[in-house]
Amino acid sequence: MRKLTSFVCGTGAGFAAYYLQRLRDPQAAVHNSWTNSDKPVDPWALWDTNWDCREPRALVRPLRNSQPEEENRYNAELEKAKAKKARHIILVRHGEYLDVGDSDDTHHLTDRGRKQAEFTGKRLSELGIKWDKIVASTMVRAQETSDIILKQIEFEKEKVVNCAFLREGAPIPPQPPVGHWKPEASQFLRDGSRIEAAFRRYFHRAYPDQEKESYTLIVGHGNVIRYFVCRALQFPAEGWLRISINHASITWLTISPSGNVSIKYLGDSGFMPPELLTNRIPRDVKNVV
C-alpha cells in the first residue's frame, strides 16, 4: 500500500513539475489553448487578418521611432481605426421559379416559391431583427422574393437597394468539375469579376464610427451566396458548388470587430414544411404554377 501511495504521489508530482515547466515556457504556453496543436498549419489554412483591407495596422502610419510621443501617436491612431461593433449579414436565396422564356422577365416565382418566401418572411419577423439595410438582386425572382418578405418585416420598400452586382452567374470554375454544367470561360471571367465586386462591396468589418451591431439582409441567388460563404470564411472559393442551399433559405454570417468571420446559419430552411423544401428548378412545368 505504501509503495502504491509513493508511486501515485511521485507520478503526480512529476506531472505537476512537467506542466509547471511548460507553463513557464512562452513557446509551450501557446499550445495550451485547445485551438492549437503541435501539427504545422498548412499555409492555405492560415487566416488573413487583412482580408477586407481594413486591418487597423494596415491603415495607420507605422512607427517612425521608439520615442514615447511617436508611440502615443501610433497607439491613438490605431485605436481610432479599430471597429467596435459586429456586422451581421443575412443572405436569403430567392424562392422556386420557372426557367421559361428567353429572358429574365419571364422567370417568375411558382406558387410554391411564393409560399417559401412567405415562410422566410415570417421567420425573419420572428427573429425580431431591426434591419439597417436590405439589398436585393435586380433579377425578377429575387425582386419578387424581396417584395413578399417585406410584407412580413418592418422595412420601407423605398429604402431597399437594388443591386445588379448580385445577379446570378458563374463565379469561378468549380472543383471538382461537373459534367452537366459547362459555362464558357468568358462567362466565368465576366460573372466572376462582378460577383467578387459584390463580395467586396458588402463583406467587410464595421466602420470605426459604427456604434451598434448592424444587420444587413441580402436577397440573392444560390451560386452567389455559396461563393460569398466560401470567400467570407476563407475557404477555397473553387469549392462553392459543393454547398447546396434550399430556395428561400437563410444563411447568416457575422463579421466581428476583429475581422474574424463566423457562420450562424447555412441554408437554414427548417422553418418550412417538408413539401416546400426545394433547391432545383422544376422541370415538370405542367404541374407547377
Curated annotation (Swiss-Prot):
| GO CC annotation, single | mitochondrial outer membrane
SMART domains recorded = PGAM
Gene Ontology MF annotations: kinase binding; phosphoprotein phosphatase activity; protein serine/threonine kinase activator activity; protein serine/threonine phosphatase activity
Write down the chemical reaction(s) this protein catalyses.
O-phospho-L-seryl-[protein] + H2O = L-seryl-[protein] + phosphate; O-phospho-L-threonyl-[protein] + H2O = L-threonyl-[protein] + phosphate
SUPFAM superfamilies reported for this sequence:
Phosphoglycerate mutase-like (SSF53254)
GO biological process terms, semicolon-separated = positive regulation of mitochondrial fission; positive regulation of mitochondrial fusion; protein dephosphorylation; response to anesthetic; response to heat
Instruction: Identify the EC number(s).
Output: 3.1.3.16
Q: Name one Pfam family in it.
A: His_Phos_1
Similarity remark: Belongs to the phosphoglycerate mutase family. BPG-dependent PGAM subfamily.
What PANTHER family does UniProt report for this protein, alphabetically?
Answer: PHOSPHOGLYCERATE MUTASE-RELATED, SERINE_THREONINE-PROTEIN PHOSPHATASE PGAM5, MITOCHONDRIAL
Name recorded for this polypeptide: Serine/threonine-protein phosphatase Pgam5, mitochondrial
